[in-house]
């Protein structure tokens, strides 16, 4: 299963407007400058470092190696200056003002905490990154992860943003231990596939939420986060190198505003025993976090440190159309691979009565508001069991590590085996054709149908 990250970009700005590049160009970058580029969906560029040193979100680029980037917004930074060869069409410009000094200082501060943790036999820093949408949270998470790996560390990286996938399809929450370099061409890299990979693959633990925003169903989001935290914390305790390195936790921008969002941040802080909070691009959020956590301590008695970091000027707004195209590209690559690896999904036809499909409920917290006297449901459920219908065409189902006989709570807490795509629904014959990464039975597993990612285009066309 090839599951690239979404490759979104961060990093600082300059007032100059981007210029279109259509052919081979040579760029001479001065020390402490950044080359920012945007590649349209369906297009690609090739970049080669001819001399000097350069990196993408902390991962160093090899000299004279050609890197290919498809449909992304990204940046290349150089500490000492470099010479780049760029081949292909993109929007690009060079910025000299960047927040990299503050970011690298943050990395060194975390390294000191990791060294202290190793000496004391304690847990390393559990870092939570918060901030509004499009402030570079994921890019900072990549950068801190890459720098930690370059120091010989093995951070556990956690994604709690269901709108974008980390080593998985959007709609899921994941955690993975990073022991090797991040694949700069694929964002976070890829998980294990049936084909070869030039960069060591990652092995994520995946849980399915299935909605775009935590606020769409808080009563489902919170227990899924709790289960993810339990799994990540257990891994931390079982691996000495991971334990001293700690965690890096990415969050959705939507929870960085309003009381409901702040309560979700508090839940994440509590479940992951967070002791470092990095606030990106919002003084108001930083003030609120100080009010909530300046006197707060973890269960181990550790104080919570808050650090406000500037948003990079290179952060750009990614409109809904761009993000939808990215999700569709991610799903297509999951089943069919990319330009480097061609994958062949297995096709199987299953009868309607063989499937156990559960639909994720939305806005469940609102339903009890209409009960008399403010009463709540005795046993609220997060899923609704549904029969196959034509509306499932082109949708994605999560195949759970559970039995069809299990309770809904057990199914919710189970990890994801993989995903299947509904290629055809035949109501007359009561059959459904699905695509799966591997030739495996899905009829003995519960399938979860969420509204996120939304139904993509016809992958078979």
Swiss-Prot record:
Required for endonucleolytic cleavage during polyadenylation-dependent pre-mRNA 3'-end formation. The keyword ATP-binding applies. It comes from the Eukaryota. Keywords: ATP-binding, mRNA processing, Nucleotide-binding, Nucleus. InterPro entries: Clp1 (IPR028606), Clp1/Grc3 (IPR045116), Clp1_C (IPR010655), Clp1_C_sf (IPR038238), Clp1_N (IPR032324), Clp1_N_sf (IPR038239), CLP1_P (IPR032319), P-loop_NTPase (IPR027417). GO terms for biological process: mRNA 3'-end processing; tRNA splicing, via endonucleolytic cleavage and ligation. Component of a pre-mRNA cleavage factor complex. Interacts directly with PCF11. It is found in: Nucleus. Belongs to the Clp1 family. Clp1 subfamily. ATP binds at residues 34, 73, 134-139. This is mRNA cleavage and polyadenylation factor clp1. One of its GO terms (cellular component) is mRNA cleavage factor complex. GO terms for molecular function: ATP binding; polynucleotide 5'-hydroxyl-kinase activity. Its main location: nucleus. HAMAP family: Clp1.
